[in-house]
A protein has these predicted regions:
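Short beta-strand-to-loop elements that line the ligand-binding cleft
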Residues: 1, 65, 85-94
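Central regulatory/effector-binding core of bacterial HTH transcription factors
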Residues: 1-25, 172
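Alpha-to-beta junction loops
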Residues: 11-16, 37, 102-108
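Short secondary-structure boundary segments
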Residues: 20, 43, 112-114
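Flexible hinge/capping segments at coil-to-helix
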Residues: 25-64
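C-terminal effector-binding regulatory domain of bacterial HTH transcription factors
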Residues: 56, 113, 118-121, 128-172
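Secondary-structure junction motif
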Residues: 59-81
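A ligand-binding cleft/hinge motif common to bilobed small-molecule-binding domains
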Residues: 98-121
Length: 172
């Protein structure tokens, strides 16, 4: 599956959440939240492979990653932050499929902490090593004054602020 884009400029949606800050004048945009990604693998995978104690150990392991040719954002180019020339054994455009591949023991995945930290089927690797990224929220300028839109906007912003620990991998 390839992520489907909707255009708030073409009125396909009223609010959009992005991996990168949109640079369109017709939009009201603000940073929604920071979030953290980290390395995870299943206990079964770790039991079958050499131990991972430092970054240099990662080169000997199997990896799970996005399909490079189908990346819709450079923010998803994550593996190079951890390993040069990784041996990728599973590619998917879906972070959910990557999560399941890691749970099933295929290899190491870079996953959002809010998705993986509370999963008993995954073990976090190299504590303290991770990547921080941001989500951005936007709406069309002419709709931003709408009470209905602002109620939802404010709710999403408040929810992310309340769940900051989860988003940054500090709690699960």
């Amino acid at each position: 599956a390839v992520p489907r884009f909707v255009s708030i400029l073409n009125r396909e949606a009223e609010i959009s959440i992005h991996l990168e800050r949109p640079s369109v004048d017709q939009l009201v945009t603000r940073k929604l939240t920071d979030y953290r990604l980290a390395l995870y693998a299943s206990r079964a995978y770790l039991d079958r492979h050499p131990p991972i104690e430092k970054r240099e150990d990662l080169a000997a392991h199997a990896w799970i990653d996005y399909v490079d040719d189908l990346l819709f954002s450079q923010e998803l180019k994550l593996l190079s932050s951890f390993c040069r020339n990784p041996k990728v054994v599973f590619h998917s455009t879906s972070v959910i499929a990557q999560h399941q591949a890691a749970r099933s023991g295929l290899g190491i995945a870079v996953l959002p902490c809010f998705m993986a930290a509370g999963d008993p089927g995954l073990v976090p690797l190299l504590p303290g090593e991770g990547i921080e990224r941001s989500y951005w929220i936007s709406s069309r300028r002419e709709l931003h004054k709408s009470v209905r839109l602002r109620v939802l906007w404010d709710y999403v912003v408040e929810l992310c602020a309340h769940e900051q620990g989860l988003l940054l991998g500090e709690s699960s």
